[in-house]
Amino acid sequence: MAVQILRDRSRAAVQKVVLGATKDQGGTRSHTIVVGGDAALPFHHFEGEIVNRPVIGMEVQDIVPDWPDVLKDPFTDVINEPGRWAQKCVAEYGADLIYLKLDGADPEGANHSVDQCVATVKEVLQAVGVPLVVVGCGDVEKDHEVLEAVAEAAAGENLLLGNAEQENYKSLTAACMVHKHNIIARSPLDINICKQLNILINEMNLPLDHIVIDPSIGGLGYGIEYSFSIMERIRLGALQGDKMLSMPVICTVGYEAWRAKEASAPVSEYPGWGKETERGILWEAVTATALLQAGAHILLMRHPEAVARVKENIDQLMVSNAY
């Protein structure tokens, strides 16, 4: 007697979100990238179509970041020039996206003006042809000014702008609507707040296919299991037809992995941990691969060797296991 293999088919799928815009679409990108569209749990090709592979955005900053030497070494020749830094990420390290973090805008730091921030975004747009993710410094008032100006200056480029949070989502949502960009909806590892924020943004008439969820992750050893659980619930909600949980997910892997002491502490202090030149790279790569299994669509990363390892893993995971 033939054995019937049961498959758990879903009645819905993750929303597709298009990043970037070509010249014909009103932008200047060489191509667009589509994320989302999954009709099954992560890489369950046997249960539904996984139409778009996860992508990696490499981080570029508008100031010299306070990173450990092992992380700065691949970029020492370009770290003072965001445009050249972005070019190196794309041309040498194969970044799918550029993740431009405007930390220089921080009033407690370099306090770059709005005009300086806009100039940096334009510099990076001119330097590379891939789509951009642009986020502010984290200061609510300054980000309000900076991101509105960036949205206007890059109108038509279909950027992914962030971060919109429950207490300050209105101005960025309005800017994304007017200037035709996508938005990152960030919530603090709380699925109820995540869903509510998506509802609030959508009620302002920004389409669901212009929203990407940042659930706030923890790095390896620092809450990643809770992040994994929240992301699983988001994916299950999407597959069960919950439109307000159906957006693609973005994860700040590099930031969370490299802030862990275990990633960058010198071997002289912790000889049993192994060389920091290898340890930090593995910390970032393993954080990323774990989050892929939870349903990440966009990984924001830092070290090129970690990026290479994760790209190889994505290649393997995208080979169909359908039967």
UniProtKB/Swiss-Prot annotation:
UniProt keyword annotations, A-Z: Carbon dioxide fixation, Cobalamin, Cobalt
Protein's UniProt keywords contain Calcium: no
Highest taxon of the lineage: Bacteria
Presence of keyword Flavoprotein: no
Binding site for 5-methoxybenzimidazolylcob(I)amide: 188
GO BP terms, alphabetized: carbon fixation; one-carbon metabolic process
Cysteine disulfide links: none
Molecular function per GO: cobalamin binding
UniProt xrefs under InterPro entries: Ac-CoA_synth_d_su_TIM-brl, ACDS_complex_subunit, CO_DH/Ac-CoA_synth_dsu, Dihydropteroate_synth-like_sf
Any single Pfam family the record assigns to this protein: CdhD
Binding partners and assembly: Heterohexamer composed of 2 subunits of AcsC, 2 subunits of AcsD and 2 subunits of AcsE.
PANTHER family: ACETYL-COA DECARBONYLASE_SYNTHASE COMPLEX SUBUNIT DELTA (PTHR36214:SF5), PTHR36214
Protein function: Acts as a methyl group carrier in the anaerobic acetyl-CoA pathway (Wood-Ljungdahl pathway) of carbon monoxide and carbon dioxide fixation.
Descriptive protein name: Corrinoid/iron-sulfur protein small subunit
Gene: acsD
